[in-house]
């Protein structure tokens, strides 16, 4: 007799997250911002210590470990960023993070500039969302328009004169020109000319 069924009675069934997709996007984007700010701060410290080593020629970093002051954005700015993050659709979260990382790699900003870059990336994502929504609305309008069948399709305007009615200069020249000499193997079928 197996004990596995007896051991399973105490297991809790797996629960799905009670968070909405908007909350998950908000949390993901804000975690990305915090992580990138820590990374930029670490890179700045490394650059400063490298410059200090070059200037002084001595490395005392092993001797004393100074407390690291961390930069944090203001609560008002954090709330504004959270508000913008909540408007981002989940499908735009990944591309926004990739664009943010790309801008950080290209520009190597100071810690104070990271939040501003993040806001600009979020604004780009919102603009792209609006453009795609407008395009989707236009395609929906075109797809919902009533269509006439091809059997009831009639041309409303006729182009006149038709190409066969238009006289060209080459036709006038050909009428006044003498007929080309005929070859002996071909009979000549012409009406006699009345002069």
From Swiss-Prot:
GO terms for cellular component: cone photoreceptor outer segment; cytoplasm; endosome; nucleus; perinuclear region of cytoplasm; photoreceptor inner segment; photoreceptor outer segment; rod photoreceptor outer segment. The keyword Iron does not apply. Keywords: Cell projection, Coiled coil, Cytoplasm, Endosome, Nucleus, Sensory transduction, Vision. Expressed in the retina and in particular in the inner nuclear layer, in rod and cone outer segments, in the outer nuclear layer, in the outer plexiform layer and in the ganglion cell layer. The keyword Cytoplasm applies. Its main location: other. Monomer. Interacts with GUCY2E; promotes the exit of GUCY2E from the endoplasmic reticulum and its trafficking to the photoreceptor outer segments. The interaction with GUCY2E negatively regulates its activity. Interacts with GUCY2F; promotes the exit of GUCY2F from the endoplasmic reticulum and its trafficking to the photoreceptor outer segments. The interaction with GUCY2F negatively regulates its activity. Interacts with GUK1; up-regulates GUK1 activity. Plays a critical role in the regulation of enzymes involved in nucleotide cycle in photoreceptors. Inhibits the basal catalytic activity and the GCAP-stimulated activity of GUCY2E and GUCY2F, two retinal guanylyl cyclases involved in the production of cGMP in photoreceptors. Involved in the transport of GUCY2E and GUCY2F to their target sites in the photoreceptor outer segment. Up-regulates the activity of GUK1, a kinase that also plays an essential role for recycling GMP and indirectly, cGMP. Plays an important role for the survival of rods and cones in the retina. PANTHER family: PROTEIN RD3, RENTINAL DEGENERATION 3-LIKE. It is linked to A spontaneous mutation leading to a frameshift and in an unstable truncated protein lacking the C-terminal 89 amino acids causes retinal degeneration. Homozygotes mice (called rd-3) display retinal degeneration, beginning at 3 weeks of age, characterized by complete loss of photoreceptor rod cells by 5 weeks, and cones by 8 weeks. This is Protein RD3. It comes from Mus musculus. The gene is Rd3.
């Amino acid at each position: 007799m197996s004990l596995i069924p007896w051991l399973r009675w105490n297991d809790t069934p797996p629960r799905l997250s009670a968070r909405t997709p908007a909350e998950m996007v908000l949390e993901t984007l804000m975690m990305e911002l915090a992580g990138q700010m820590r990374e930029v701060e670490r890179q700045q410290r490394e650059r400063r210590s490298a410059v200090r080593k070059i200037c002084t020629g001595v490395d005392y970093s092993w001797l004393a470990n100074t407390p690291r002051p961390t930069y944090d954005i203001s609560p008002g700015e954090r709330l504004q960023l959270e508000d913008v993050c909540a408007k981002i659709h989940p499908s735009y979260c990944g591309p926004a993070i990739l664009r943010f990382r790309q801008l950080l790699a290209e520009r190597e900003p100071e810690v104070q500039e990271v939040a501003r870059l993040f806001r600009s990336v979020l604004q780009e994502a919102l603009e792209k969302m609006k453009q795609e929504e407008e395009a989707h609305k236009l395609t929906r309008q075109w797809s919902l328009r009533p269509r006439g069948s091809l059997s009831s399709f009639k041309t409303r305007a006729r182009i006149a004169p038709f190409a066969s009615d238009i006289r060209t200069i080459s036709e006038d020249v050909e009428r006044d020109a003498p007929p080309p000499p005929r070859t002996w193997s071909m009979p000549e079928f012409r009406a006699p000319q009345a002069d």
